[in-house]
């Protein structure tokens, strides 16, 4: 064992020595590592807690570095030529053993200057590859390159398992003017936990998780993890080649919305592995085309369902490793399912280890709470006017779409981004530069985001959760729109659910709640969403919204689903809705799968499968979703009977949906049809296979030359109560 070395005065002044040992020195490369001293090379090493330090040359020559103070070592190293990082290694004796490593302060700058300039100018293209923790080999030495954007920080160090979380040991180099701090640490590899210790502009020292970490600890732990960067072995080439066609506005899109943590409890099995084995096949068997996941990004509070994320580049560790998530996506693609992620660029939580005041200033957020704090969620709002923040968010979006082969992003809370006065009373918001309420910077960001996705991720889609009548959400950016592919139709959802909650005897007075959606159905490219938001916070389940006894509730839910699947717009249904979950969704418990022991609930599930099949295989139900010529009212004004009938058409086919929203049968109900001939029943929600009582119309009906509702031909049938029928014209 080496003996403690005698101390020396050293060549550093006392103030510099004190700053290094106190963790306050802002430019460690100016004093640590190899430095020319006349004709000789001096090596200085800061290793608090070390007993001895040796500099070892490639030929084996060993030079002891002598302590100026405990933990700060220096000596002239004979034969050492400066400028060659591999010219020596360090042999450090700690209380627990010997460490052999290259000297981090022997390496020059490791980040590409041109790429840094690009990022500093607001470019996102290189951001995910520059910042964060990345495996690197520098001058033949393997390790990890760390980088953090913190332009106003006085000092930044990387701390972790590899240095005992001692912020003095690995202070970073500032790359001015980009405001990025960097350090290459030899011998640090995948799995190492780390954080950044930041001495902020406000004089406070804080520990921050890596904003661009690609792996993170599971809460309540908050450290980032150096990722394993071995590429995943994807098998989805065929899917990726055809996904653009599967996601166009003329394609059938039926989305199964899932919270990964509560879909199924597989006795403690890793979540993504368990889901990969079950969920894709289940969704495929029911005819869904996509799975949409509530946010999977790392988030500190499970009760937020992921909508308050802090790790915009890392899958939540509670569900498994990043490779497990990639495997899940790959399995979905193997099953013919697209994967959409909910993504949250609207706000972020103010947890101490997160983005809030990251460098001692409001860096990612606004300084003024009238712009920077969200009144609904008590979270912080991104400063979209800052080019580096926009680049950070766009880099996150592209990361999920490219690195994980995700097929789309559903952008959360877009309305809160578009309006400066969103949920704010008078006097509590700041107008834009023109004196208006529109958030011009957020508008520019959304347009830039959608343009980037379109160029960088061909075939991927973006979907806006936008709850107002903002014009042009799905219009092209070139035409002044925001550039989304689809928008959630929140108005349709609110109107129709409000209607369904009413006692059927009163529905005649609210007929417009069902029909009004067609007034604006083609203003945007819409998704009809029955999402998680409708089964939480005391709203009850979808089944529970239906009035009456259990049999009536199930009949009305079947009717409502058939109305929705026939209505123009892509479909979205939250998990549990497919079999009539009775209780409100609880993110801490799995779905009520035991309900499928009941034939009535199995029948509802079977109806969803049949609706998806009919929707996907009959082109008139999807190919003109964005074209007004694909829809025509037949009976839109029969409020007294609470009956609706409408046609869905394409160039060669016609399907008529007839819906009775009361329990009262309508015998001899006549309605016009566009074509003479036979009309076959494709769906009858009252059929026994769906849990109904049966007794519906015959499988085939022939039109009569009796004019009705503006058509020379008509059908007449006995229309059961709480029933929807799909009738397709036979060529």
Swiss-Prot record:
Gene3D superfamilies: Glycosidases, Golgi alpha-mannosidase II, Immunoglobulins. The active site is at residues 412, 465. The keyword Transferase applies. It catalyses: Transfers a segment of a (1->4)-alpha-D-glucan chain to a primary hydroxy group in a similar glucan chain. InterPro entries: A-amylase/branching_C (IPR006048), Branching_enzy (IPR037439), GlgB (IPR006407), GlgB_N (IPR054169), GlgB_N_E_set_prok (IPR044143), Glyco_hydro_13_cat_dom (IPR006047), Glyco_hydro_13_N (IPR004193), Glyco_hydro_b (IPR013780). Its EC number is 2.4.1.18. GO terms for biological process: glycogen biosynthetic process. Transmembrane segments: none annotated. One of its GO terms (cellular component) is cytosol. SMART domains: Aamy (SM00642). Pathway: Glycan biosynthesis; glycogen biosynthesis. It comes from the Bacteria. Keywords: Carbohydrate metabolism, Glycogen biosynthesis, Glycogen metabolism, Glycosyltransferase, Transferase. GO terms for molecular function: 1,4-alpha-glucan branching enzyme activity; cation binding; hydrolase activity, hydrolyzing O-glycosyl compounds. The keyword S-adenosyl-L-methionine does not apply. PANTHER family: 1,4-ALPHA-GLUCAN-BRANCHING ENZYME. Catalyzes the formation of the alpha-1,6-glucosidic linkages in glycogen by scission of a 1,4-alpha-linked oligosaccharide from growing alpha-1,4-glucan chains and the subsequent attachment of the oligosaccharide to the alpha-1,6 position. Belongs to the glycosyl hydrolase 13 family. GlgB subfamily. Monomer. This is 1,4-alpha-glucan branching enzyme GlgB. It comes from Bordetella bronchiseptica (strain ATCC BAA-588 / NCTC 13252 / RB50). The gene is glgB.
């Amino acid at each position: 064992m080496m003996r403690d070395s005698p101390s020396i005065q050293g060549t550093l002044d006392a103030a510099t020595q004190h700053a290094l040992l106190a963790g306050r020195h802002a430019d460690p490369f100016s004093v640590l590592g190899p430095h020319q001293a006349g004709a000789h090379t001096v090596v200085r090493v800061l290793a608090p807690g070390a007993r001895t330090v040796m500099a070892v040359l490639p030929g084996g020559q060993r030079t002891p570095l002598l302590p100026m103070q405990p933990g700060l070592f220096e000596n002239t190293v004979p034969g050492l030529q400066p400028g060659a990082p591999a010219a020596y290694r360090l042999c450090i004796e700690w209380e627990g053993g010997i460490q052999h490593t290259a000297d981090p302060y022997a390496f020059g700058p490791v980040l590409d200057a041109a790429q840094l300039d690009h990022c500093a100018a607001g470019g996102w293209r290189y951001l995910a590859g520059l910042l964060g923790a990345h495996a690197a080999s520098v001058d033949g030495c393997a390790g990890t390159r760390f980088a953090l954007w913190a332009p106003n920080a006085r000092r930044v160090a990387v701390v972790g398992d590899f240095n005992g979380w001692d912020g003095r040991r690995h202070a970073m180099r500032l790359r001015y003017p980009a405001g990025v701090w960097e350090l290459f640490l030899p011998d640090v590899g995948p799995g190492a936990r780390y954080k950044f210790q930041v001495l902020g502009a406000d004089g406070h020292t804080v520990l921050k998780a890596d904003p661009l970490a690609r792996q993170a600890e599971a809460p309540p732990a908050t450290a980032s993890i150096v990722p394993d960067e071995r590429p995943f072995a994807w098998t989805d080439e065929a899917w990726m080649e055809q996904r653009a066609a599967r996601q166009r506005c003329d394609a059938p899109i039926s989305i199964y919305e899932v919270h990964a943590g509560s879909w199924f409890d597989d006795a403690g099995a890793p979540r993504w592995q368990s889901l990969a084995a079950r969920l894709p096949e289940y969704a495929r068997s029911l005819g869904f085309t996509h799975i949409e996941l509530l946010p999977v990004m790392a988030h500190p509070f499970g009760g937020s369902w992921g909508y308050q994320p802090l790790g915009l580049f890392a899958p939540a560790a509670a569900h498994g490793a990043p490779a497990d998530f990639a495997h899940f996506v790959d399995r979905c693609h193997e099953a013919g399912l697209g994967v959409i992620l909910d993504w949250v660029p609207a706000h972020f939580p103010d947890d101490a280890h997160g983005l809030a005041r990251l460098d001692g200033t409001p860096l990612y957020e606004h300084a003024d709470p009238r712009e920077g704090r969200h009144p609904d969620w008590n979270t912080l709002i991104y400063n979209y006017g800052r080019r580096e923040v926009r680049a950070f968010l766009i880099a996150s979006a592209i990361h999920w779409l490219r690195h994980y082969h995700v097929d789309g992003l559903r952008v959360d809370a877009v309305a809160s981004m578009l309006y400066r006065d969103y949920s704010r009373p008078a006097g509590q918001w700041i107008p834009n530069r023109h004196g208006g309420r529109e958030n011009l910077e957020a508008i520019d960001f959304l347009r830039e985001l959608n343009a980037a996705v379109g160029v960088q991720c061909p075939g991927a889609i973006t979907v806006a959760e936008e709850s107002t009548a903002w014009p042009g959400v799905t219009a092209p950016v070139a035409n002044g729109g925001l550039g989304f592919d689809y928008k959630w139709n929140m108005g349709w959802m609110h109107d129709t659910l409000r209607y369904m909650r009413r006692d059927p005897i009163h529905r005649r007075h609210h007929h417009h709640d069902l029909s009004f959606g067609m007034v604006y159905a083609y203003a945007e490219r819409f998704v009809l969403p029955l999402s998680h938001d409708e089964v939480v916070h005391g709203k009850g389940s979808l089944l529970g919204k239906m009035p009456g006894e259990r049999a009536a509730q199930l009949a009305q839910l079947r009717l409502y689903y058939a109305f929705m699947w026939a209505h123009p717009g892509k479909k979205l249904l939250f998990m549990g809705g497919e079999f009539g979950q009775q209780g409100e969704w609880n993110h801490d418990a799995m779905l009520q799968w035991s309900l499928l022991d009941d034939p009535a609930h199995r029948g509802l599930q079977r109806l969803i499968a049949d609706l998806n099949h009919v929707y996907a295989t009959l082109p008139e139900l999807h190919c003109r979703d964005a074209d007004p010529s694909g829809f025509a009212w037949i009976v839109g004004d029969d409020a007294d009977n609470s009956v609706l009938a409408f046609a869905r058409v394409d160039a060669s086919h016609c399907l008529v949906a007839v819906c009775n929203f009361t329990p009262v049968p309508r015998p001899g109900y006549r309605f016009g049809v566009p074509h003479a001939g036979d009309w076959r029943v494709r769906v009858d929600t009252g059929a026994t296979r769906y849990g109904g009582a049966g007794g519906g119309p015959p499988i085939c009906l022939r039109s009569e030359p009796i004019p009705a509702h503006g058509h020379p031909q008509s059908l007449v049938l006995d229309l059961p109560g709480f029933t929807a029928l799909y009738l397709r014209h036979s060529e």
